[in-house]
C-alpha cells in the first residue's frame, strides 16, 4: 500500500463500492454542498466524483466512484524514480544568497523590525504599512507611554486627526471601557474593535488640543489609572488588541501593541492613519516612503513583523507521543498543537534523532485528495509515500505533516473549485489567480519549530520546492542539501508538474530549475537516468 490512512485502506480492501461516502455521522440535511469536481484516482483505474460540503463549521468530502478505462497511470508514464533515487544532498538546485533568505532581512524598501523596535523604545514614531490587499495604508505609531504634546502635534498634523490607542483587553476591562458596538453589530470593513472614546479628567480642558490628547494617552497607558479618571465620550479612541497580535490578526492595532511589547514597554500604543499632504486622501506606499525619507522615520511592513514574530515566538506545544506501526515500518508519532490557531500537526520519527545532525527530513503539506484518496492530479501522495519509504530504508529521519496547507493554503473547497478551472484550461497557478487567491500562502514556521523540538539541527531536506528551504531557514536549522523526490509522471499530472517547474521554481532532479528540460520532452526522465547512473557508479 502507498497511502497513509487506515480508512482509505479499509475502503480499498472492500473494493470501494460506488456511491460509498466517507463522512462523519450526520444527516444530509446538516450539510451544504459547496463544490464538486471529477477526480481521476491513482488506484484500481477508477475515476471519482468529489463533492465538497460544509457542516458544523467543518469541511467534508463525499466520494462517488465508478470503474473507468485504465487511463490514469499510463503504461508509458515517464518514471521520475523510486527508492533508487540518489539520497545524497543536492545543493546546486536551490542556490540562494543567505541574506535573501534571512527572516530578519526586511522587504525591499522597508526598514528592519529590530530597527523599528529600537526607535519605539526611544519614544520615536514608526510608520507601519499593511498588506496591499487589505488597506494598503500606513499609520504613524509610537508607544503610548512615551507620547509628548510635541509628538501628538506631529501626529495630528500629518494624520487624519482620529487618534487611537491600542490596548489589551485586560486594561480595557480594568478601565471599564466597553466596545462602541458589539462584535455582532460591528459593520466596519476590517472589524476594528473601537471602544467608547475618552478624555482624561485631570490636566485637560477641551480635550482636543495636542497637550490634552497627550495627557489622555498617558493616562490610558498608566497601570495606575482607574475608570473614574476619564470622561466619556472624548477625543481619544481606544482600540481592543486581539490576543496573539499580528499572528492572529494582521492589523495596525495588533502591530502597534506588538511593537510596544517587543520594545519592553507597556502594551499600549498610539496610532493614526497618515494622509497625503497634497489632496488629503489616504497616503499609499510611494507617498509613505517619501514621507519616511523626508522625516527620517523608519517604515516597516506588517508582513515583516509577522515573519519576525514567527521566528521568535513559541508557536507549538507537544501534545503526546506514541509508537505507531505503519505500512512502511515502526515509527514514533508526535502530535503538536499550534498555539496560534489550535490546529494539530503530526511528526513521524524513525530511529534516534540523537545529536540532530544530518537528519533526513520531509516537511509535507496536507493534501486530502492526494494523500488519502490517491488523486492523480498531483504528486503529493506519491511524494509522501516515497519520503516514508526512503526514511524507513535509511533507518533514521522525520516526516512533519502540516495540516491546514490544503491546496497550497487555500483550503479544500477552493482547491476543488480550482480543479474545475483547470478542467476549463487554466493551469494550477492561473486557477488560483482567477479565484482571487494566492498561488501559495503556506507558512513553514510551525514545521520548523516542530523539527527544533524534536532535536533536529542539520538536515537533508526531501523536496522539489525551493520555498520550503526558504521557509525553514532562520529557525536554528541548517539545510545541508536537498534530496529530490522523483515520482511517476502521468498523463493526469504532467501539466501540473510542468507548471510548478516553470512558474513556481520547482526543481526536479539535480539541476537548477533554469536548466532542467521540460517534462514534455522527457527531460525529467533524463534527469532520473543521470541520477541512477551516478548511483550505480557510487
From Swiss-Prot:
HAMAP family: RibA, RibB, RibBA. Pathway: Cofactor biosynthesis; riboflavin biosynthesis; 2-hydroxy-3-oxobutyl phosphate from D-ribulose 5-phosphate: step 1/1; Cofactor biosynthesis; riboflavin biosynthesis; 5-amino-6-(D-ribitylamino)uracil from GTP: step 1/4. GTP binds at residues 362-366, 383, 406-408, 428, 463, 468. Its EC number is 4.1.99.12, 3.5.4.25. GO terms for cellular component: chloroplast. Residues 1-16 have a biased composition (Polar residues). Mg(2+) 2 binds at residues 135, 252. D-ribulose 5-phosphate binds at residues 134-135, 139, 249-253, 273. Keywords: Chloroplast, GTP-binding, Hydrolase, Lyase, Magnesium, Manganese, Metal-binding, Multifunctional enzyme, Nucleotide-binding, Plastid, Riboflavin biosynthesis, Transit peptide, Zinc. In the N-terminal section; belongs to the DHBP synthase family. Binds 2 divalent metal cations per subunit. Magnesium or manganese. Binds 1 zinc ion per subunit. This is Probable bifunctional riboflavin biosynthesis protein RIBA 1, chloroplastic. The keyword Glycosyltransferase does not apply. Signal peptide: none annotated. The active site is at residues 440, 442. It comes from Oryza sativa subsp. japonica. Zn(2+) binds at residues 367, 378, 380. Residues 1-73 form a transit peptide. It catalyses: D-ribulose 5-phosphate = (2S)-2-hydroxy-3-oxobutyl phosphate + formate + H(+); GTP + 4 H2O = 2,5-diamino-6-hydroxy-4-(5-phosphoribosylamino)-pyrimidine + formate + 2 phosphate + 3 H(+). Residues 1-29, 506-538 are annotated as: Disordered. Its main location: plastid.
Amino acid at each position: 500500500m502507498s497511502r497513509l490512512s487506515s480508512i482509505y485502506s479499509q475502503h480499498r480492501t472492500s473494493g470501494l463500492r460506488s456511491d460509498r461516502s466517507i463522512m462523519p455521522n450526520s444527516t444530509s440535511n446538516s450539510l451544504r454542498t459547496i463544490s464538486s469536481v471529477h477526480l481521476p484516482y491513482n488506484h484500481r483505474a477508477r475515476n471519482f466524483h468529489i463533492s465538497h460540503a460544509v457542516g458544523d463549521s467543518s469541511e467534508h468530502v463525499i466520494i462517488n466512484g465508478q470503474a473507468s478505462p485504465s487511463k490514469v497511470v499510463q503504461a508509458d508514464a515517464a518514471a521520475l524514480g523510486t527508492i533508487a533515487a540518489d539520497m545524497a544532498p543536492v545543493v546546486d538546485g536551490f542556490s540562494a544568497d543567505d541574506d535573501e533568505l534571512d527572516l530578519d532581512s526586511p522587504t525591499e524598501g522597508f526598514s528592519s523590525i529590530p530597527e523599528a523596535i529600537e526607535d519605539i523604545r526611544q519614544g520615536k514614531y514608526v510608520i507601519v504599512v499593511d498588506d496591499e490587499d487589505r488597506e494598503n495604508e500606513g499609520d504613524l505609531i509610537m508607544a503610548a507611554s512615551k507620547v509628548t504634546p510635541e509628538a501628538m502635534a506631529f501626529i495630528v498634523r500629518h494624520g487624519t486627526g482620529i487618534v487611537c490607542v491600542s490596548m489589551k483587553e485586560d486594561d480595557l476591562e480594568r478601565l471599564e471601557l466597553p466596545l462602541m458596538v458589539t462584535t455582532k453589530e460591528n459593520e466596519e470593513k476590517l472589524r476594528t474593535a473601537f471602544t467608547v472614546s475618552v478624555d482624561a479628567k485631570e490636566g485637560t480642558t477641551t480635550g482636543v488640543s495636542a497637550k490634552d490628547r497627550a495627557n489622555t494617552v498617558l493616562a490610558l497607558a498608566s497601570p495606575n489609572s482607574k475608570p473614574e479618571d476619564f470622561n466619556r465620550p472624548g477625543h481619544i479612541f481606544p482600540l481592543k488588541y486581539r490576543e496573539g497580535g499580528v499572528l492572529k490578526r494582521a492589523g495596525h492595532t495588533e502591530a502597534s501593541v506588538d511593537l510596544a511589547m517587543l520594545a519592553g514597554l507597556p502594551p499600549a500604543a498610539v496610532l493614526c492613519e497618515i494622509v497625503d499632504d497634497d489632496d488629503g486622501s489616504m497616503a499609499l506606499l510611494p507617498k509613505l516612503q517619501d514621507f519616511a525619507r523626508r522625516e527620517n522615520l523608519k517604515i516597516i511592513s506588517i508582513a515583516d513583523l509577522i515573519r519576525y514574530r514567527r521566528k521568535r515566538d513559541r508557536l507549538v506545544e507537544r501534545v503526546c507521543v506514541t509508537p505507531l506501526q505503519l505500512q512502511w515500518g515502526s515509527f514514533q508519532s508526535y502530535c503538536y498543537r499550534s498555539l496560534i490557531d489550535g490546529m494539530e500537526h503530526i511528526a513521524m520519527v524513525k530511529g534516534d534523532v540523537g545529536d540532530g545532525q544530518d537528519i533526513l527530513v520531509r516537511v509535507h503539506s496536507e493534501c486530502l485528495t492526494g494523500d488519502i484518496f490517491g488523486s492523480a492530479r498531483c504528486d503529493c501522495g506519491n511524494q509522501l509515500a516515497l519520503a516514508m519509504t526512503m526514511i524507513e530504508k535509511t533507518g533514521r529521519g522525520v516526516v512533519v505533516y502540516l495540516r491546514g496547507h490544503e491546496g497550497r493554503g487555500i483550503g479544500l473547497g477552493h482547491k476543488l473549485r480550482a480543479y474545475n478551472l483547470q478542467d476549463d484550461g487554466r493551469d494550477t497557478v492561473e486557477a488560483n489567480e482567477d479565484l482571487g487567491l494566492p498561488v501559495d500562502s503556506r507558512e513553514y514556521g510551525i514545521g520548523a519549530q516542530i523539527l527544533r523540538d524534536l532535536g533536529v539541527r542539520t538536515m537533508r531536506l526531501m523536496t522539489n520546492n525551493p520555498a520550503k528551504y526558504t521557509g525553514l531557514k532562520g529557525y536554528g536549522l541548517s539545510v545541508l542539501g536537498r534530496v529530490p523526490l522523483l515520482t511517476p509522471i502521468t498523463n493526469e499530472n504532467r501539466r501540473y508538474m510542468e507548471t510548478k517547474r516553470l512558474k513556481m521554481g520547482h526543481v526536479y532532479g539535480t539541476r537548477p530549475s533554469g536548466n532542467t528540460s521540460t517534462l514534455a520532452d522527457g527531460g525529467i526522465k533524463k534527469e532520473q537516468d543521470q541520477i541512477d547512473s551516478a548511483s550505480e557508479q557510487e
